[in-house]
């Protein structure tokens, strides 16, 4: 099966806007900074529970979730 890679640039911008750093956001999300970095670079994927929590923490509208988490890299 072909691996799908997602573009998290918009997510990274929102994290910086709301939390100032990936470290602060990873702490709020309850994961390590390394784990968040692995997810943001496509080494591992976000779980559904992590996406749900991130949506709340980042105050994303339900309709915008795909823009932040499911935009494929081209």
Residue ranges and their predicted role:
Residues 65-74:
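Short amphipathic recognition helices of helix-turn-helix/homeodomain-type DNA-binding modules
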Residues 13, 38, 67:
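DNA-binding alpha-helical recognition surfaces that contact promoter or target DNA
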Residues 19, 45-48:
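Residue at a beta-strand N-cap/secondary-structure junction
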Residues 49-65:
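DNA major-groove recognition helix of helix-turn-helix/homeodomain DNA-binding modules
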Residues 41-42, 52, 70:
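Residue-level detection of the helix-turn-helix DNA-binding "recognition helix"
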Residues 19-38:
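Short alpha-helical DNA-recognition segment
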Residues 1-20, 24:
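A short, Lys/Arg-rich alpha-helix, primarily the initiator
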């Amino acid at each position: 099966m072909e691996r799908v890679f997602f573009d998290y640039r918009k997510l990274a911008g929102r994290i910086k806007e709301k939390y100032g750093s990936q470290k602060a956001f990873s702490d709020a999300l309850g994961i390590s900074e390394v784990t968040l970095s692995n997810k943001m670079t496509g080494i591992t994927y976000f779980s559904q529970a992590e996406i749900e929590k991130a949506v709340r923490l980042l105050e994303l509208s339900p309709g915008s979730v795909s823009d932040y988490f499911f935009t494929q890299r081209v």
